[in-house]
Structure formats: structure tokens, C-alpha cells
A protein has these predicted regions:
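Alpha-helical transmembrane segments and membrane-interface helix-loop junctions
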Residues: 1-162
Length: 162
């Protein structure tokens, strides 16, 4: 499981980081075309918006993998280790179900609907950009399963004070 987590982390860091770098370059290009060349680039503005969504959702998957998602430590910090383990597994299950229903199922639905719609400046099917929703959902589910296995094996620190 640790190898899978490391591989996913590396891939997501490259994709999210690459999106950020490309967004920065394209935003600089927008400034140059708008203020220096006096001919604004519309396609780059649209692409930056889609890259931002990709970066945010892939970054959210990374956070899920690090168990950095929102929690309420007050509820578990005074519990016994066995109860803490149970609550952590429950939390991961809720996150996995949410990702499966909202991101995977809902993402597939919206992606298939958006395949017929084209972007205004790029001329690409909107579904191409929406595919990040089910992708992120699948990654979140995978990370949740890895987290549950590691919680049950005791390889994850359940100390909530960190």
C-alpha cells in the first residue's frame, strides 16, 4: 500500500504542479497580449480556468491521501485507541462514499452530458475538462481504501493533536 500511495502522490504532485506552472505561464502570456500587444488572448484565459479546476481537484485528492481532510478532533481526542480507530475508519468510509457518489457517479453523468457542448474559445468538448471530476473521485476512493487498510494495520498515526 505504501508503494501505491507514493506512486499516486508523485503522479498527482507532477500533474497539479504542472497545472500550476502552466497556469502561471499562461497568465503571464495574457498580460503580455493584453497590455503590450494590445490583442488579448481569449483562449489562454479559458484554459487557465480549466487548469485551476484540475489543480484544485487533484490537490484535493492529495489532501485526502494525506488524511488532511476536515475533521473534528474534539470528538476523538479523549477516546480510547480502539474507539479512535473505529471513528477514523468511519470517517474514511464517509469520505469514500461521498467521493464515489458525488465525484465518480455525478462526474460521469456531467462529463457525458458535457461531451456535446464545446468550449467557446478552445473549441474542445467541455467533457474533456470535466473528466477530472470522476478521476478525482476514483483517486479519493483509492486513497480512502489505502488509509483504511493502514489504519487497521496500525501503520498510520491516529494522534489528532498533530
Amino acid at each position: 500500500m505504501s508503494q501505491l500511495r507514493k506512486a499516486l502522490n508523485m503522479i498527482l504532485n507532477v500533474l497539479a504542479g504542472g497545472s500550476f506552472i502552466l497556469m502561471t505561464v499562461l497568465t503571464c502570456w495574457q498580460v503580455i497580449t493584453r497590455y503590450i500587444l494590445q490583442n488579448p488572448s481569449s483562449w489562454s484565459e479559458e484554459l487557465v480556468s480549466y487548469l485551476f479546476a484540475w489543480m484544485a481537484l487533484l490537490g484535493a485528492s492529495l489532501v485526502c491521501g494525506e488524511r488532511g481532510h476536515m475533521n473534528i478532533p474534539l470528538l476523538v481526542e479523549k477516546d480510547s485507541p480502539s474507539m479512535r480507530k473505529l471513528l477514523c475508519v468511519f470517517s474514511e468510509l464517509v469520505a469514500a462514499v461521498f467521493a464515489a457518489v458525488i465525484l465518480v457517479y455525478g462526474g460521469i453523468q456531467i462529463t457525458s452530458l458535457a461531451m456535446a457542448q464545446m468550449t467557446s474559445s478552445l473549441g474542445v468538448a467541455m467533457g474533456v475538462f470535466y473528466v477530472v471530476l470522476p478521476l478525482s473521485g476514483v483517486l479519493n476512493v483509492i486513497y480512502s481504501v489505502i488509509n483504511i487498510v493502514e489504519i487497521m494495520n496500525g501503520t498510520i498515526n491516529l494522534d489528532v493533536t498533530e
